[in-house]
Each structure stands twice: as C-alpha cells, then as structure tokens.
C-alpha cells in the first residue's frame, strides 16, 4: 500500500510505517503525477484536494487531512468517487486556545494593562473558540460568544450578536472558518467599517483564517488608530503576508497557533485511527508513546501565581516572543513562511508542565487551564 503524505506531518513513520510504503511530499507543490498510484493520501491545509489533483488516480482508498478545517478539500468530489475522507476536528483546539490566551497575557504585560477584569469576545464558538473560552473562564475572565450558526442549531450556551460583542468586548478573538458566500459569510467579516467601529484600545487576535480580516483595510485603519493592538497568526495571501501589515502587529507568527507537539500528534493519530478502522485492523499505537518528555519535570509554586507569574509559567511552556522574532526576521525571505512552519517543532501545551503546590489557596483554576499535577 502506497501512502503519500505531507512531509511536514509528524509521527507518520511510527504510526503508518507498518501499514505500507510511506512517500513524503511537499504538500504545497503536490502534483497529480505524485499521487497517481497512491492508495492513501494524507495532507494538511496547504494542499488543494480536488479533481485536478486526483482524476488520474483510479485506486485511491482514503484521503485524510490532519486539520480542523476542510475548505481545502472538495468533499463533493470525493463523495462522488466514493473515496472515504476524514479530517481531525479538534486536534489542535487546545493549542489554539492556549496560543490566544498566552497572546492576551503577553499584551497585558507589554502595555501594563491587566487581562484580569477585561471582557473578551470570541467570534466563532467551535472547537478552537471553545478552547479559548475554557482558558479565559478558568482564569475568571468574562467571555462573550458570537456564533449565529451554533445558536441556530440549538447550542445551549448564551450567544450575543456581533454588534453587541463589538460594543462590549475589550478583546476580540477570531475563531471562524472561512466561508465566501451565504448568510454567514466570513470573508472580510472585519472590513474597514467594522474595524473602524472597534472600541478604543481594543485588542484583536486572529488565529483562524487571514481572509476573515480585510488585511488592506487593516493597514489603513492601523495608520489612523494606533490604539488598536493586533496579534496576527494568519494572513491574507499566505504564504506571502503583506509586508506593510507586519510592523502593525504586536505579535506576528506564521499560522502556527495550532502547532503544539500534542496538537500535531493528535491530528496524525486521528487519521491513523480512521485508516485502521477502514482497514478493519486494530489501532494498537498510543498517542502518549509519541511525545518526548518535557524539559521541566515540575515547577514548585510557593504561592498562588498572580498574572505576572502566570505569564512566566506560560512562557516555560511556550514563549510567543521567540516565534514573533523569528517571523519578523524570516517572513520576507524566499519560502520563509513555509520554512518557519516546517521548522516549528518545539512548542508544548500547558499539560506538559506539572505544577507542585501544597498551600492553602484555591488553585483548581490552574488545573482547569490545563496544567498537570496541580496540588499533588
């Protein structure tokens, strides 16, 4: 069995090696010739999976995408051909939620404006939006949710209109898929008028899709409103962000909000489970076996951490400033964006760090944030 796989997908060999011949490829430049005799195709969001790519392959048995979204896959085409498809919904939700939360802590420290006491509006209450809300609510932050689709589906959570959210939120975090038409179109959801309407001193965090914000309009608005603070992990025109926009972002990264080791492993592992199910063979590998030990065995807490100490704990796990510096130095180089993504292998989730605390104060919130070993 030939398994054609994006070369940047981790843990493929230990999971799929016993199932067939693994053929690594560049996912962004993948050609029909490279997949014409594949039995299995495993991709990420940089690969367009459609008739143009697959028409020459008569034997494909499974397509898997190690991603939350599916906008890069022609699902109707796969269905017509009877090719099973699976993605990995929620695989990197924890990573994205923690990224957004850490970014807010970093902004709070940079501008001496505590996160505690602010109101955060989350646009899009799916897996990543919910994971962001989980972090914020664990820390005691008031969260407003906007998601008209979830609301219409009967989701029991309380939702507000986008206008209400814009009016009340001090921080806005975007977590919607890209939809280019229809009643709930998200393409340029934040256009010039909406950006100009943001409250004074709003923080805007985007780690969903670059096109959700009109980037050209964002440049224009930032030229007029220095009070708006931006965290941008995604960009229109990836892998070629608008160079004029980068200096306006407080933190800029190359679409890696979901790139924790845990999230990457989870995405590949979910596809492994699905393929084993299709082949009717036992999935006898374990996710925990894939991850390396964390470089800190445990951190002893002498007292309940304040916001400054919480940021330091977060930096033990992931220091956003490092990726920001690498991005500014490398995004304009040839293939710089993709090279940074490919080389991004170091980040862990809060769960990798064990905290030891034996005081009397309530620290369940640290456990709810995701840290392990709290109070043990």
Curated annotation (Swiss-Prot):
The active site is at 209, 238, 255 (proton donor). It is found in: Cytoplasm. NAD(+) binds at residues 147, 233, 258. It catalyses: 4-phospho-D-erythronate + NAD(+) = (R)-3-hydroxy-2-oxo-4-phosphooxybutanoate + NADH + H(+). Pfam families: 2-Hacid_dh, 2-Hacid_dh_C, DUF3410. SUPFAM superfamilies: Formate/glycerate dehydrogenase catalytic domain-like (SSF52283), NAD(P)-binding Rossmann-fold domains (SSF51735). Its EC number is 1.1.1.290. Pathway: Cofactor biosynthesis; pyridoxine 5'-phosphate biosynthesis; pyridoxine 5'-phosphate from D-erythrose 4-phosphate: step 2/5. Keywords: Cytoplasm, NAD, Oxidoreductase, Pyridoxine biosynthesis. Catalyzes the oxidation of erythronate-4-phosphate to 3-hydroxy-2-oxo-4-phosphonooxybutanoate. Homodimer. This is Erythronate-4-phosphate dehydrogenase. The lineage of its organism: Bacteria, Pseudomonadati, Pseudomonadota, Gammaproteobacteria, Alteromonadales.
